[in-house]
Amino acid sequence: MTYTRYERARIVGARALQISMGAPVLVKTVKIDPLDIALEEFDADRVPITVKRQFGTCSEVL
């Protein structure tokens, strides 16, 4: 999936916040920093967050 840098930052930041609040981690890792874990999940395409883009009158869900 291709995301803009802004979408990527929003997804990783939101997931890092979820992890820091106690959400289960979806990849096996030895890291303890929520941001590093969120980046690993994003790179492994395991982040349970969707992006809704709007193009004119249509919308696309990624």
Curated annotation (Swiss-Prot):
<comment type="subunit">
    <text>Part of the RNA polymerase complex.</text>
</comment>
<comment type="similarity">
    <text>Belongs to the archaeal Rpo6/eukaryotic RPB6 RNA polymerase subunit family.</text>
</comment>
<dbReference type="InterPro" id="IPR036161">
    <property type="entry name" value="RPB6/omega-like_sf"/>
</dbReference>
<dbReference type="GO" id="GO:0003677">
    <property type="term" value="F:DNA binding"/>
</dbReference>
<keyword id="KW-0808">Transferase</keyword>
<dbReference type="GO" id="GO:0006360">
    <property type="term" value="P:transcription by RNA polymerase I"/>
</dbReference>
<keyword id="KW-0804">Transcription</keyword>
<keyword id="KW-0240">DNA-directed RNA polymerase</keyword>
<protein>
    <recommendedName>
        <fullName>DNA-directed RNA polymerase subunit Rpo6</fullName>
        <ecNumber>2.7.7.6</ecNumber>
    </recommendedName>
</protein>
<dbReference type="GO" id="GO:0005737">
    <property type="term" value="C:cytoplasm"/>
</dbReference>
<comment type="function">
    <text>DNA-dependent RNA polymerase (RNAP) catalyzes the transcription of DNA into RNA using the four ribonucleoside triphosphates as substrates.</text>
</comment>
<dbReference type="InterPro" id="IPR006111">
    <property type="entry name" value="Rpo6/Rpb6"/>
</dbReference>
<keyword id="KW-0548">Nucleotidyltransferase</keyword>
<dbReference type="Pfam" id="PF01192">
    <property type="entry name" value="RNA_pol_Rpb6"/>
</dbReference>
<dbReference type="GO" id="GO:0006366">
    <property type="term" value="P:transcription by RNA polymerase II"/>
</dbReference>
<dbReference type="GO" id="GO:0042797">
    <property type="term" value="P:tRNA transcription by RNA polymerase III"/>
</dbReference>
<dbReference type="InterPro" id="IPR020708">
    <property type="entry name" value="DNA-dir_RNA_polK_14-18kDa_CS"/>
</dbReference>
<dbReference type="GO" id="GO:0003899">
    <property type="term" value="F:DNA-directed RNA polymerase activity"/>
</dbReference>
<dbReference type="GO" id="GO:0000428">
    <property type="term" value="C:DNA-directed RNA polymerase complex"/>
</dbReference>
<keyword id="KW-0963">Cytoplasm</keyword>
<dbReference type="InterPro" id="IPR006110">
    <property type="entry name" value="Pol_omega/Rpo6/RPB6"/>
</dbReference>
